[in-house]
UniProtKB/Swiss-Prot annotation:
EC number: 6.5.1.2
GO cellular component, one term: cytosol
Function: DNA ligase that catalyzes the formation of phosphodiester linkages between 5'-phosphoryl and 3'-hydroxyl groups in double-stranded DNA using NAD as a coenzyme and as the energy source for the reaction. It is essential for DNA replication and repair of damaged DNA.
Cross-referenced PANTHER family: CHROMOSOME TRANSMISSION FIDELITY FACTOR 18 (PTHR23389), DNA LIGASE (PTHR23389:SF9)
Catalyzed reactions: NAD(+) + (deoxyribonucleotide)n-3'-hydroxyl + 5'-phospho-(deoxyribonucleotide)m = (deoxyribonucleotide)n+m + AMP + beta-nicotinamide D-nucleotide
UniProt entry tagged with the keyword Protein transport: no
GO terms (BP aspect): DNA repair; DNA replication
Gene that encodes it: ligA
UniProt keyword terms in alphabetical order: DNA damage, DNA repair, DNA replication, Ligase, Magnesium, Manganese, Metal-binding, NAD, Zinc
Name of the protein described by the UniProt record: DNA ligase
Single GO molecular function: DNA ligase (NAD+) activity
Disulfide bridge map: none
Length: 668
């Protein structure tokens, strides 16, 4: 065997090992090797592929590329992806069950080969983006696609490969299409928003936006997960029951949600619906209902389909936070980054116990894709108590409506707007009021310079009446200036002056966060300080040095480098330092012998002595990793009052549960 064949053999060997380790880590939640050992093998594979040019499509190195696509190609599914009919209440569910059981009894009366009375499989209805993954006769993932119309979707193969729990190769020799739901966990959502210049609004948008992003690097940053639940097309695999199909998916290494319940009647189904509704808010991801499907495949074939839906399955929808109302106008707002975004102004409507008058419209592409027009009736949806989003329009209401036009000039300073991808930006960073006001508010925020009492209204007063036109101008304000402002008396003026003075000695990580470096949130700022110790070291760090820091990839690293290349940024920092701002080192050495160093901790319930942010900071200062969900990798669950399902899961897994009192004793 020559040297190149030996290297090819080693590449095959490494791919098999690494894919096995990924399955154990992401699907089984039971890793058998350390991160260090995995990284060692991964680096060996990268080097061998680079040296030989021999790269297999199912290599783990192909999960994340530097690909930026120009468009999404259409893909025709081998078997239709059906929508599900919906039951909004138990009575509608009973009607569905009774209707099907009558059809089955009539079939059995007319045929010798009878069908069994149905049992029903209950699974969660995930609130993400449906994906259809095709594997060829060699078991290799060759296509990933969106649902689209159900017949034709969009090719998102590069994007789905970034989902680390998705197998790139399976031990199956038949052409097969596997369906699932790509989701963003709450943990991944929080972690992404810590670093994001423009935070995500909800989990569903996080998943859907990632998979429909032409820049695969952006998709990878979202750290998506997935659950698979159906085989839509198979040339060689036959199943007698749905449970048998699920067993096959598990055996092939697909991530399958452990909640799968078989029920024999409406009484058992009602009990399960109540159980899922009770634990819904404790889950690490969003669901919007339960899918109820007949288990027996032959029965499914007999029941067949309507024009729109399979008769053998139905979705029980939880009480929806959705409504229909009229779009009156669109308001264009400028953010801290200069991004100009549309907000819908609506006729008032009650939704989830709140009166809704405004809703999110992400950008012009979103407006065009959803066919949103002024005067149209629109569907709005509210998730996790955030500002609602327009999901689409009532087609019948489009007559006599008006097109929404993108502004050509900034709605505040009238500077010409520029297009960057799907977004509009105002480049007038020096005198565009909303940009400067929001920058001042961010700079003064608690996680940044912590200038107590400095609100957005105060920032607007400073801008309009004191001619504050830069961050540095904050430190030139005098008490007599403040006393000229409306509602500023002696005490309030003294408080603001003291707060500004006290902010001059921030933690270095807080100062870094206050600078508004794109993609650098609170955690990344701390990671930078922990690794580089000083501001100058961070400013002068190379791409290699930055990406060697855990959780910092090329996108964040490039953001840091490009930020500190800007002359006006360096001038602003120099100005702040000359005005007396003196950042101090804030990372203390972790005592290696503390009981939480290197451990994974989950916090649940309400603590008496700490807010969620405070306990997270405390644990991270002790060297712990704070996770949002309980798994076999969890070392401790810190439980406060009204601890929920995380407490129960910890009990099931035998994970040590500690009270707040025990925690305080352990750290002291």
């Amino acid at each position: 065997m020559d040297i190149s064949e030996e290297k090819k053999r080693r590449i095959h060997e490494l791919i098999e090992e690494l894919n096995k380790y990924a399955y154990e880590y992401y699907v089984l939640d039971n890793p058998t090797v350390s991160d260090k050992e995995y990284d060692k093998r991964y680096d060996e594979l990268v080097n061998l592929e680079k040296e030989t040019g021999f790269v297999l499509s199912y290599s783990p190195t192909q999960r994340v590329g530097d690909t930026v696509l120009t468009q999404f190609d259409k893909y025709t599914h081998k078997s239709r992806l059906w929508s599900l009919d919906k039951a909004q209440n138990i009575e509608q569910l009973k009607e569905w069950i009774n209707r099907n059981e009558k059809i089955i009894m009539e079939y059995n009366r007319l045929n010798e080969e009878t069908l069994p009375m149905p049992t029903y499989i209950l699974t969660k209805k995930f609130d993400g983006l449906t994906v259809n993954c095709t594997y060829d006769e060699s078991g290799i993932l060759v296509k990933g696609a969106t649902r689209g119309t159900g017949i034709i979707g969009e090719d998102i193969t590069s994007q789905v490969k970034t989902i680390k729990c998705l197998p790139l190769r399976i031990a199956n020799n038949n052409l097969i299409e596997v369906r699932g739901e790509a989701i963003m966990t709450k943990e991944a959502f929080d972690k992404y928003n810590e670093k994001a210049e423009i935070p995500l609004k909800n989990l569903r948008n996080g998943a859907a936006g990632a998979l429909r992003n032409l820049d695969v690097r952006e998709t990878a940053k979202r750290n998506l997960s997935a659950f698979f639940y159906d085989i839509g097309y198979s040339e060689g695999n036959e199943f007698k029951t749905y449970m048998e199909m699920i067993g096959f998916l598990i055996s092939m290494g697909f991530p399958v949600d452990p909640y799968i319940k078989e029920c024999k009647d409406i009484v058992e189904i009602k009990d399960e619906i109540k159980y899922i509704e009770d634990i819904r808010n404790e889950l690490n991801y969003d669901i919007d209902g339960i899918v109820i499907a007949i288990n027996h495949i032959k029965t499914r074939e007999v029941l067949g389909y309507t024009v729109k839906f399979p008769r053998w399955a139905i979705a029980y929808k939880f009480e929806a936070e959705e409504a229909t109302t009229k779009l009156i106008d669109v308001e264009w707002n400028v953010g801290r980054s200069g991004r100009v975004t549309p907000t819908a102004l609506l006729e008032s409507v009650e939704l989830g116990g709140a009166t809704i008058k405004r809703a999110t419209l992400n950008n012009m592409d979103d407006i065009i894709r959803k066919k949103v027009r002024l005067g149209a009736e629109v569907f709005i949806r509210r998730s996790n108590d955030v500002i609602p989003e327009i999901m689409g329009v009532v087609e019948s209401s489009l007559e006599n409506t008006e097109e929404i036009k993108a502004p050509l000039k900034c709605p505040y300073c009238e500077s010409k707007l520029i297009n960057e991808g799907v977004h509009l930006f105002c480049e007038n960073t020096l005198s565009c009021k909303p940009q400067l006001v929001k920058s001042l508010v961010h700079f003064a925020s608690r996680e940044a310079m912590n200038i107590e009492g400095f609100s957005e209204k105060t920032a607007e007063q400073f801008y309009e009446e004191l001619n504050i036109k830069s961050i540095g101008d904050l430190y030139r304000v005098k008490k007599e200036d403040l006393l000229t402002l409306d509602k500023f008396k002696e005490k309030k003026a003294d408080n603001i002056m003291n707060a500004i003075e006290n902010s001059k000695k921030p933690k270095l990580s807080s100062f870094i966060y206050a600078l508004s470096i794109p993609n650098v949130g609170v955690k990344t700022a701390r990671d930078l300080v922990k690794s580089f110790k000083t501001l100058d070291n961070i400013k002068n760090a190379t791409i290699e040095e930055l990406t060697s820091v855990k959780d910092i990839g090329e996108i964040v690293a490039n953001s840091v480098i490009e930020f500190f290349k800007q002359e006006n940024i360096n001038e602003s920092i120099k100005e702040l330092l000359e005005l007396g701002v003196t950042p101090i080192m804030d990372i203390t050495e972790i005592k290696k012998d503390n009981k939480f160093n290197g451990k994974t901790i989950v916090v649940t319930g309400t603590l008496e002595g700490y807010t969620r942010n405070e306990i997270k900071e405390k644990l991270e200062a002790l060297g712990a990793k704070v996770s949002g969900s309980v798994s076999k990798k969890t070392d401790f669950v810190l439980a406060g009052e009204e601890a929920g399902s995380k407490y129960n899961k910890a009990m099931e897994l035998g994970i040590r549960i500690i009270t707040e009192e025990e925690f305080n004793e352990m750290i002291n």
